[in-house]
From Swiss-Prot:
Subcellular location: Cytoplasm
Protein name, as recorded: Phosphate acyltransferase
Any one Gene Ontology cellular component term annotated for this protein: cytoplasm
UniProt-listed GO biological process terms: fatty acid biosynthetic process; phospholipid biosynthetic process
SUBUNIT field: Homodimer. Probably interacts with PlsY.
Any one Gene Ontology molecular-function term assigned to this protein's record: phosphate:acyl-[acyl carrier protein] acyltransferase activity
Pfam families listed in its UniProt record: FA_synthesis
Origin superkingdom: Bacteria
Length: 356
């Protein structure tokens, strides 16, 4: 019998704390009954909320801590004040100590990345971690990274992300040779900053077993032009938030238009099934959850403001990463595929101050 997937939850993370975290965990548990949980947070509060989730309570244990990383805390402050005591740190530490297979938090992104990087460390050959998101596209789904782990990138780190993103796409989408593109301001080879152009040269010329297809632009992400889109964290995070905002905006436009006249209401009723499919496709909660790639352990970041359904999607992703042995597959992908050292200015370190 297969052992259950052990998930460590930062029960206090996010805008809504245990209420959303535990409700989302139970939704995911219905889909993946071979899961157990360790809940890190205020024992009294977690126990009280858990009374409403008996199925989750039956497969969970609580580890008390009353130290919580705030959404506005700087990563350096979070590390100094409660590094070894906070619910966020304890969840990550459980992965390091092999007490859990994966950690999930909806807390402060910068603090989570700083703690994960400090505690788990990067894999051999990886200069820094990246956050990878699953992106709905016209052709299905793609992997986009980095979406906010750090600002700026060297050519070497972009190539590392291409290798890790390819491994993730193989795991998630069951692809033999996922296509990879570098996000740029144009598809012509002469365009872009030097780091991006140098990364493109390495991916073209070095034998890294990456199915590189060239530069892609912002509109190619949603079009699904490639299976993996690689970019640095600043532009990646802006692209992610823009896409989420656009989806919500279009949803609001549709709701307003459908209720404007009686003809529109009748039309909505006649096409209700089609609108339901559209609504599900545009729901950003379906793609909630970013994977911290490049660390010696799996950490999943949920949006802080998500609801129970959104958090459940992040827990689902955590489950899939463990069941599909993402860590082992990335390590295997890195063997013999290290990009050469390239001269590039060192950008701002991972765990950017003020991220949330």
């Amino acid at each position: 019998m297969t052992a259950p997937v052990r998930i460590a939850l930062d029960a206090m993370g996010g805008d809504h704390g245990p209420e959303t975290v535990l409700a989302g965990a139970e939704i995911s548990l219905w889909r993946h009954p071979d899961t157990s949980f360790v809940l890190y947070g205020d024992e009294a509060r977690v126990t009280e909320v858990l009374k409403s989730h008996p199925k989750l309570a039956a497969v969970s244990r609580i580890v008390h801590t009353d130290v919580v990383v705030g959404m506005d805390d700087k990563p350096s402050q979070a590390l100094r004040r409660g590094r070894y005591k906070s619910s966020m740190w304890r969840a990550i530490d459980a992965v390091k100590l092999k007490e859990a297979d994966v950690a999930v938090s909806a807390g402060n992104t910068g603090a989570l990345m700083a703690m994960a990087n400090f505690n788990l460390r990067t894999m051999p050959g990886i200069s820094r971690p990246a956050i990878a998101a699953i992106w709905p596209t016209l052709r299905g789904e793609s992997v986009v990274l980095d979406v906010g782990a750090s600002i700026g990138a060297t050519a070497k780190s972009l190539v590392e992300m291409a290798i890790m993103g390819s491994a993730m796409a193989r795991v998630l989408f069951d692809l033999e040779a996922p296509t990879v593109g570098l996000l740029n301001v144009g598809v012509e080879e002469i365009k872009g900053v030097e780091e991006v152009k140098e990364a493109a040269r390495i991916l073209r010329e070095e034998n890294l077993d990456v199915n590189y297809r060239g530069f892609v632009e912002g509109n190619d992400i949603g079009a699904g032009t490639v299976d993996v889109v690689v970019t640095e964290g600043f532009s990646g995070n802006i692209a992610l938030k823009t896409a989420e905002g656009t989806a919500k905006q279009l949803g609001s436009y549709l709701r307003a238009a459908m209720g404007r006249t009686w003809r529109a209401r009748i039309g909505y009723l006649l096409a209700r099934d089609a609108f339901r499919v559209l609504r599900e496709k545009m729901d950003p909660r379906r793609a909630n959850g970013g994977v911290f790639l490049g660390l010696n352990g799996i950490v999943i970041k949920s949006h802080g403001g998500t609801d129970a359904e959104g958090f459940a999607a992040a827990v689902d992703l955590a489950y899939d990463m463990v069941r599909n042995e993402l860590l082992a597959r990335i390590e295997k992908s890195l063997v013999g595929r290290q990009p050469p050292d390239v001269a590039a200015c060192r950008p701002q370190a991972a765990g950017v101050e003020g991220q949330s």
